[in-house]
Amino acid sequence: MISSNDFRTGTTIELDGAVWRVIEFLHVKPGKGSAFVRTKLKAVVSGSVVEKTFRAGEMVPQALLEKSKLQHTYMDGDEFVFMDMTSYEETRLTAKQIGESRKYLKEGMEVNVVSWNEKPLEVELPNSVVLEIKETDPGVKGDTASGGTKPAILETGAQVMVPLFISIGEKIRVDTRNDSYLGRETQ
């Protein structure tokens, strides 16, 4: 159980048999009446967002999520197959469960799979990944670090804005949280 006073962004709770993640919260102390906590909750499974108000100090069941490090091995139709590299046990997730994470997911990548009651819910990517540029406009002589950007398509199909001097075939580091270019990767 967790008190509504202890809610923070990212806290997971159980309501009506589902797992919800707190995405916004506000402690309100009106002039009259008792204090309350106004929250915006996102369903981990369906992605729907609702607003809910809790009394200050109200106890709510906390959802205890398990994270396990798995490797994305292959696609099977519409399902992504992950393998635990110690037990060789397979876990399957649908494209809907993976959501926006799929644009950075490539075979052989290790990710955290979040489970609740031994049922996989979602994938947590690392904060940054290294991917190869598959398609972008060619660089022109004189395109240095002047601050300009151009769109580039990565090997996974994701599109990010990169500096003008980046060309096809180069490996770059991308921030998976905000789809931004972090730098060239030299190997």
UniProtKB/Swiss-Prot annotation:
Disulfide bonds: none annotated. It holds the Pfam family EFP. Its main location: cytoplasm. GO terms for molecular function: translation elongation factor activity. Keywords: Cytoplasm, Elongation factor, Protein biosynthesis. GO terms for cellular component: cytoplasm. GO terms for biological process: peptide biosynthetic process. CDD domains: S1_EF-P_repeat_1 (cd04470), S1_EF-P_repeat_2 (cd05794). Pathway: Protein biosynthesis; polypeptide chain elongation. The keyword Cytoplasm applies. It is found in: Cytoplasm. InterPro entries: Elong-fact-P_C, NA-bd_OB-fold, Rib_uL2_dom2, Transl_elong_fac_P/YeiP, Transl_elong_KOW-like, Transl_elong_P/YeiP_cen, Transl_elong_P/YeiP_CS, Transl_elongation_fac_P. SMART domains: EFP (SM01185), Elong-fact-P_C (SM00841). Involved in peptide bond synthesis. Stimulates efficient translation and peptide-bond synthesis on native or reconstituted 70S ribosomes in vitro. Probably functions indirectly by altering the affinity of the ribosome for aminoacyl-tRNA, thus increasing their reactivity as acceptors for peptidyl transferase. Belongs to the elongation factor P family. NCBIfam families: efp, PRK00529.1. This is Elongation factor P.
